[in-house]
Amino acid sequence: MSNVDESQPLITHLVELRNRLLRCVICVVLVFVALVYFSNDIYHFVAAPLTAVMPKGATMIATNIQTPFFTPIKLTAIVAIFISVPYLLYQIWAFIAPALYQHEKRMIYPLLFSSTILFYCGVAFAYYIVFPLVFSFFTQTAPEGVTIATDISSYLDFALALFLAFGVCFEVPIAIILLCWTGITTVKALSEKRPYIIVAAFFIGMLLTPPDVFSQTLLAIPMCLLFELGLLVARFYQPKDDESAVKNNDESEKTQ
């Protein structure tokens, strides 16, 4: 009988997890269905930074017969997930929140909200700042006689890779705050390692962007600035731990 009672909480959690995952899937499907009619318009919007700087008369191409149909559909599915992120995060939060203490909830609320905003900011930065600069540079430096005709599927893969790279890298402040909050490191220790972190930012930029110094620099510089922002905000999360440690030391000295 006791084994049955002990298994009940686990079964309850699994049922709740299934229900929340089902809600996430339904949300993404509904958004996708609402957007699928506009799939070609969505692709044109994403491709606009490239088509705006292409030479007169140049167009994008499709090297496979099924590509013009499946590529916009693929993009629409990804956009549906992208739009659904706040709801998906809410479902995740609703599942794990009951296991957290009240002070942990107060600390995580702003982190969860800001991480979502930072990811969206990273994607927007890539689209409105990086794409026009990179595509303009590439089209202007093309050898004479070379016609730019980018495959629509290759462009989508390229754009999604940059969107993901910039979105993730804009989470640097959140990573720093979590590292300092959990006691893995401190603001002072990270500040002392600043030269190495700058080098690491350019190395990460080299790995996540196309093989050119221009794209690498456009990713590394925001990462360095966001690193400084993370250090600034992390100071508000760390002192409480320091104060509690000092109090514990004082109490231990008094008992001795």
From Swiss-Prot:
Which family is it part of? Belongs to the TatC family.
S-S bridge residues: none
Q: Which UniProt keywords apply?
A: Cell inner membrane, Cell membrane, Membrane, Protein transport, Translocation, Transmembrane, Transmembrane helix, Transport
Cite the GO molecular-function annotations of the record: proton motive force dependent protein transmembrane transporter activity
What are the TM regions of this chain, as residue ranges? Answer: 25-45, 77-97, 117-137, 158-178, 195-215, 217-237
- Entry's InterPro entries? Sec-indep_translocase_CS, TatC
Biological process annotations from GO = intracellular protein transmembrane transport; protein transport by the Tat complex
> Mind telling me what this protein is named?
Sec-independent protein translocase protein TatC
What binding partners and quaternary form does the record give? Answer: The Tat system comprises two distinct complexes: a TatABC complex, containing multiple copies of TatA, TatB and TatC subunits, and a separate TatA complex, containing only TatA subunits. Substrates initially bind to the TatABC complex, which probably triggers association of the separate TatA complex to form the active translocon.
Q: How does it sit in the membrane?
A: Multi-pass membrane protein
Describe its function.
Part of the twin-arginine translocation (Tat) system that transports large folded proteins containing a characteristic twin-arginine motif in their signal peptide across membranes. Together with TatB, TatC is part of a receptor directly interacting with Tat signal peptides.
Is Transmembrane helix given among the entry's keywords? yes
Q: Pfam families per the record?
A: TatC
Compartments, record wording: Cell inner membrane
Origin: domain of life: Bacteria
